[in-house]
């Protein structure tokens, strides 16, 4: 064993330190030989001192004679060890003591030149217990060697990154990036590779002092440790330009073991010290070849001694490894990178008090920040910055919808701007990455702008764990939902509300809502309303991008969904039907027998037969589905029972105007007066249980309709033919009278003849009405009847137009579109006020439609008319003579430019009867007016710039926040248009 007398052999000690584990196992011998080869490369000792080591290692344990001789020579100077207990034991003890002695002399001669004596004394004080124990024989020696092996293995385990198995990491370091791509290209590529694992940000850094030039590395920061772990395992072989990238984890506990302040405050444990020592023995890029150069690179006993002394706090902590300054900075703040302020750089370097503000800022996420929205405020911009500069700098973060740069006016020196993205995730990502970056010459400051409330919400933070039913269940608490655009698995969704108040309430309360767990919270922001739904109206045939609520959710809360379905335009109904029934191709099939026979008797050439039959079928299916969802056998008879009090002037508040849409398009006040609708009513009475069967088994709306028609075809054929013949006869007798004035039929008393002519007049086009009704009915516009024709006046301009009924009661339009003094028909409607298209005012119009009831409103479609339809009355002639005739699209363009609707008080000239009053609103094409249009109405309009939607509500002689027109400004605007 080792004593103080064996210090005089320090020159040969380096050779023996490498041979320590040779006496353990063959596997240990191989590993030690590899390490010895690595150690021989940087060693500075003489070649003649290394050659005996090679000979010893080649011979292994067979050269016992030479080892015995050496042990005898060295044992003479330290005979007081008590190691002379037999020849074999003496040889083994001498060999072990030589190993320890050589390591100690190596540490004293090479590593600690100035403090060799102190080091030697430490070794002696530590090795004396082992010397006493070694006199016991081979058992003690083997246990001592086993203990050394255990200490080595424990030290190796403690030197693993992160200091243990429980360490977490949220940051991945990507190195070996090469120099082919720019920093922005690398950052974009890494972001797109890792964004699928969770919320991520990427930072590119250049590390100086590593090799011949600066090394470029990337730090990928995740919000959750499990996301970083999944990304590291999934992206283990990332390739860039055919070069595999190196991915390393930056552990959270690695920084603590390296900080002197942390060691002073918290005494280091053995595992932390092991990580520190292991870190110094394995510097980056050095491998295992630098083991002998580290302070802890002594023998096994000395290493264990150092660990014990560090745990007790007697020795100062080891010096930190020579890391570059930039790398040290990056490891100080990788977790505060995403939301760092651009004007405060001190907290990036400091790890003490300076890091606390960053930790507080990092806590403010989009889920918690009430100011977070898709609009960014850009401050400290260069005075020469342009929109293209900002788009070029921010375009990589997402879709930019609007850029607004505010130039400094007189007395101001700062330039700022606003940048609007498509959603909150894009703006948040841009805010984190571009804060403090230099654009042209100035480092910009980025904050959130002011949110613009809309009725459409963007909801982020979703995933496969959020079903559509759960999303609808959580958001329908705040108001009626019109549509939800979401596919399960998407990361965000769009929710369209009916009112602005409901959307604002959901925006306020659902931000940060834990939908799917405490770590999966929602991000909510307002979104644009016009783009998505205009596409649905312009292209109705492709499949929609949202799913209908599942059956389970439909059974849970049918009432809110029914309310949303009543307010949804019919076109969206058809798209939802296609989602429910993907097996149907939705190609218009041959029309049913009832439709074909009716057309054959009433027309000569069925010009609009496919479109009309398809629209009738879809309208009937929408109505049947609404009734079937109520799950009541007698619900189909309920609308007919309501009609009796409605005809006598009663109004019902429990029916929304949209729910009566399919029935109200027929130009008759009551379905009882129409032979066609009477036959359909009889057909529904004949199979009374169809609603329950439709609810339980309905593979397709068209199939159900065909089945019911084929079932009752035989006993209803005669009734259909008689109804068609009677309608054709009534049409021939009453058409010339209606050609003179479409309103004279309303002056008669209630009877079957006027109502029949009303039902047949829905097949007349505007040109046929103006020509006296003598043209054939084949070119008629389907399901739209002419309710009024004349001039719309706005100051000194008149616009010929025709109005066709879309929804509601034709009697409302007939009774209010008259002269107040004489009661005769009115040929001109003069717009004197306008209503701003604000959401609260639009909600008020909708509320008044509901309050008025089915018999209290009428919705008309105004299209361009002919100048030949000008009335010959003296007052009309005088007004039109002093005004300039212009096309209707000029009026539409003016109202769209003003973002307003025209307002007309009815009847014209006032009326003493307060009960027979109303108001007309003329809406230009907008989201509010488009909900009342369907395919036949759009076919009649022919263009988005040539129609107005007229809403007449009875019983309201006052207006909602209207604004009187300025005559000079009005004339100038119309002249320019």
Swiss-Prot record:
Comp. bias intervals (Gly residues): 135-150
Pfam families: RRM_1, SPOC
Protein's GO biological process: branching involved in blood vessel morphogenesis; dosage compensation by inactivation of X chromosome; negative regulation of myeloid cell differentiation; placenta blood vessel development; positive regulation of transcription of Notch receptor target; regulation of alternative mRNA splicing, via spliceosome; regulation of megakaryocyte differentiation; RNA methylation
One example GO MF annotation: mRNA binding
Gene Ontology CC terms: nuclear membrane; nuclear speck; nucleoplasm; nucleus; RNA N6-methyladenosine methyltransferase complex
Positions of modified residues (N6-acetyllysine): 450
Full protein name: RNA-binding protein 15
Family: Belongs to the RRM Spen family.
Compartment annotation: Nucleus speckle; Nucleus, Nucleoplasm; Nucleus envelope; Nucleus membrane
Low complexity compositional bias, start-end: 119-130, 151-160, 866-884
Lineage: Eukaryota, Metazoa, Chordata, Craniata, Vertebrata
Every SPOC domain range: 777-956
Topology versus the membrane: Peripheral membrane protein
Biased segments, Basic and acidic residues type: 1-10, 35-52, 59-72, 98-113, 555-581, 613-661, 673-728, 741-750
Region (Disordered): 1-167, 256-298, 555-778, 865-884
Subunit structure and binding partners: Component of the WMM complex, a N6-methyltransferase complex composed of a catalytic subcomplex, named MAC, and of an associated subcomplex, named MACOM. The MAC subcomplex is composed of METTL3 and METTL14. The MACOM subcomplex is composed of WTAP, ZC3H13, CBLL1/HAKAI, VIRMA, and, in some cases of RBM15 (RBM15 or RBM15B). Also a component of a MACOM-like complex, named WTAP complex, composed of WTAP, ZC3H13, CBLL1, VIRMA, RBM15, BCLAF1 and THRAP3. Interacts with RBPJ. Interacts (via SPOC domain) with SETD1B. Interacts with NXF1, the interaction is required to promote mRNA export.
Function: RNA-binding protein that acts as a key regulator of N6-methyladenosine (m6A) methylation of RNAs, thereby regulating different processes, such as hematopoietic cell homeostasis, alternative splicing of mRNAs and X chromosome inactivation mediated by Xist RNA. Associated component of the WMM complex, a complex that mediates N6-methyladenosine (m6A) methylation of RNAs, a modification that plays a role in the efficiency of mRNA splicing and RNA processing. Plays a key role in m6A methylation, possibly by binding target RNAs and recruiting the WMM complex.
Omega-N-methylarginine modifications at: 578
Annotated phenotype, changing residue 923 to A: Disrupts interaction with SETD1B
Sequence positions bearing Asymmetric dimethylarginine: 578
Positions carrying Phosphoserine: 109, 179, 208, 210, 253, 257, 259, 292, 294, 365, 622, 656, 670, 674, 700, 741, 765, 767, 781, 935
Occurrences of domain RRM (ranges): 170-252, 374-451, 455-529
Predominant location category: nucleus
Polar residues biased stretches: 752-771
